[in-house]
Amino acid sequence: MRLVLLGPPGAGKGTQAQRLVARHGIVQLSTGDMLRAAVAAGTPVGLKAKAVMDAGGLVSDEIVIGIIAERLDSPDAKNGFILDGFPRTVAQAEALDQLLASKGLKLDAVIELVVDQEKLVNRILNRAAEAQAKGEAVRKDDDPVVFKTRLEAYNRDTAVVAPYYKARGQLKQIDGMAPIDQVTAAIDGVLAEAA
């Protein structure tokens, strides 16, 4: 099972990815985690990434795809994976398609968690208020200013990825505003259809 989960920050992608990993024995591939691991391991692609990051630059799509290619060859990724934080642009989606094709693979599903962004902002504000009321630290991502900045970046840069997959007939949309268990059940339904 090879999946991409799409949706804005706060839509519940991380929660659903954790549930999919636990139920299906697949791995969650976070580009940020993979980048750090490749740098730490000193792989050829990791060394390229380190040079760029040390110079204060953004890691290119080519390097990120190289890191994903290395990671897909790992034994634990053979049963499948969920991509988290990738692709973020149409160019990355196209590069991912080419990478998978070169390995004789394809995505089984691209699932978008569709949310009402105004209600989503309220959800995040409530989550932050609940954490404060319990005396817990508020997640940096839940700071209203930070969250709105992330949402604007998503709308500007990443929202175009869903139409890319829709045009290819790969996109399945799920109501991300539903209760968590209902979202999980809807994802399971999509995966059953794809199997």
From Swiss-Prot:
Binding annotation for AMP: 31, 36, 57-59, 85-88, 92, 150
Cysteines engaged in disulfide bonds, as pairs: none
Main localization (coarse): cytoplasm
Gene Ontology terms: biological process: AMP salvage
Region NMP, annotated ranges: 30-59
Tree of life domain: Bacteria
Reaction equation(s) it catalyzes: AMP + ATP = 2 ADP
Subunit relationships: Monomer.
PANTHER family: NUCLEOTIDE KINASE
Record's comment describing the protein's domains: Consists of three domains, a large central CORE domain and two small peripheral domains, NMPbind and LID, which undergo movements during catalysis. The LID domain closes over the site of phosphoryl transfer upon ATP binding. Assembling and dissambling the active center during each catalytic cycle provides an effective means to prevent ATP hydrolysis.
Family the entry assigns: Belongs to the adenylate kinase family.
Entry function: Catalyzes the reversible transfer of the terminal phosphate group between ATP and AMP. Plays an important role in cellular energy homeostasis and in adenine nucleotide metabolism.
Protein known as: Adenylate kinase
The species this protein was found in: Xanthobacter autotrophicus (strain ATCC BAA-1158 / Py2)
Gene that encodes the chain: adk
